[in-house]
Amino acid sequence: MAKSKYYVVWNGRKPGIYTSWSACEAQVKGYTGAKFKSYPSKEEAEAAFRGEEATPKLAKEEIIWESLSVDVGSQGNPGIVEYKGVDTKTGEVLFEREPIPIGTNNMGEFLAIVHGLRYLKERNSRKPIYSDSQTAIKWVKDKKAKSTLVRNEETALIWKLVDEAEEWLNTHTYETPILKWQTDKWGEIKADYGRK
């Protein structure tokens, strides 16, 4: 079950404390100079809203809503791994991978980004991709998933997919920007499975 989060909006259409990302997003999406942040408890959110915390820094860049967001849902690490890609603006699921029996979170994030690159290239789209995994972003740029997961019969499927993804990266070019989703400033990525 997903943990509750509280979203403080200092600068937005209606400043206040919200209990869901969608409610918070409605106040800040497209709002110039929006300031907001998520907190794990109501008490922390209330203290922050009263100004008992340093005013949060403005995001270095606005969210690019015309983009693709990818994320992984995992049960255990290593454990069952699945991923999906969604339209950042609407939340519409554009692709998803059925659960893989054994894998790691980072491997799933890597596969999700590469799937996103392939998806956008097939559609001649130059939209950027957001991922909340710095590790997976680096692996994609290096064209190599540096996972320490053992290769055996149990992990054969995820390693087959990773090998295929690395092969694709080494035989194709792309101009798609891969951007880090700033969870601490923007809340959970749109593709989040809500299992944290």
UniProtKB/Swiss-Prot annotation:
Keywords: Cytoplasm, Endonuclease, Hydrolase, Magnesium, Manganese, Metal-binding, Nuclease. It holds the Pfam family Cauli_VI. It is an enzyme of class 3 (hydrolase). It catalyses: Endonucleolytic cleavage to 5'-phosphomonoester. Binds 2 metal ions per subunit. Manganese or magnesium. InterPro entries: Ribosomal_bL9/RNase_H1_N, RNase_H, RNase_H1_N, RNase_H1_N_sf, RNase_H_bac, RNaseH-like_sf, RNaseH_domain, RNaseH_sf. Its cofactor is Mn(2+); Mg(2+). Coiled coil: none annotated. One of its GO terms (molecular function) is nucleic acid binding. Mg(2+) 2 binds at residues 71, 109, 132. PROSITE patterns: RNASE_H_1. Mg(2+) 1 binds at residues 71, 192. Changing residue 192 to N: Strongly reduced activity with manganese. Loss of activity with magnesium. Residues 58-196 form the RNase H type-1 domain. GO terms for biological process: DNA replication, removal of RNA primer. Its EC number is 3.1.26.4. Endonuclease that specifically degrades the RNA of RNA-DNA hybrids. Belongs to the RNase H family. This is Ribonuclease H.
